[in-house]
Regions:
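Signature for HUH/AEP ssDNA processing cores
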Residues: 2-133, 140-156
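Short, glycine/charge-rich beta-strand/loop segments that flank catalytic centers
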Residues: 129-134, 171-175
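Flexible helix-coil linker/hinge segments at domain or subdomain boundaries
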Residues: 158-178
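Short linear functional motifs in flexible/disordered or boundary regions
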Residues: 25, 136, 149, 162, ...
Length: 178
């Protein structure tokens, strides 16, 4: 079965998941490890020559960041590739903030955080992580907002609902993006 991704699906994605447009990340897996790295344009023939001379992709100079295009988003929505955004814009603002939760009690702590957001009329959305052993709580902004301010607000909410404390090392709260 082939998935159809229409223009309005791509526009919906772009209306929510806004980040840097000049670069995006692609997920990789190799030898049991995985992660994300920037997507690049490069000449594979020149890279192969560079590699034969002892070079690595990291020190290969003839590469440029690949911009996040509608085509790349379409491939992501079809499941052909996994795209990651760089949410922190050049001016240190972002269109969203995400709280990452892991460990055994992640769901309980996510629910506490969601209730705190609701108490302050902050729309927040829970997503289960790829592993299934954690969650991400997404908060979207109507306009790009200074990242340091959004982080302060979210940390204060996490502390208020008892999910995070600088002294508590057992919290399932892991980090914020950006």
């Amino acid at each position: 079965m082939r998935l159809m991704v229409e223009a309005h699906h791509i526009e919906l994605f772009k209306s929510l998941f806004k980040g840097r447009e000049d670069v995006f990340a692609l997920r990789w897996e190799k030898n049991g490890k995985s992660g994300y790295m920037p997507a690049y344009f490069y000449d594979p023939y020149r890279f192969r020559q560079h590699k034969m001379n002892g070079g690595t992709f990291q020190n290969f100079a003839d590469k440029k960041y690949k911009a996040l295009s509608d085509q790349e988003i379409g491939r992501h929505l079809k499941g052909e590739q996994l795209v990651g955004l760089y949410p922190l814009l050049i001016n240190n603002t972002s269109w969203f903030v995400v709280a990452d939760f892991d460990k055994n009690d992640w769901l309980e702590q996510c629910v506490k955080f969601l209730k705190a957001c609701e108490e302050y009329f902050i729309p927040a959305y829970l997503e289960r992580s790829r592993s299934g052993n954690g969650g991400h709580v997404w908060i979207f902004f109507e306009e790009a907002y200074p990242a340091y301010k959004s982080r302060r607000i979210i940390i204060a909410l996490l502390e208020k609902c008892g999910v995070f404390s600088v002294f508590d090392k057992s919290s399932s709260f892991d980090r914020l993006f950006p």
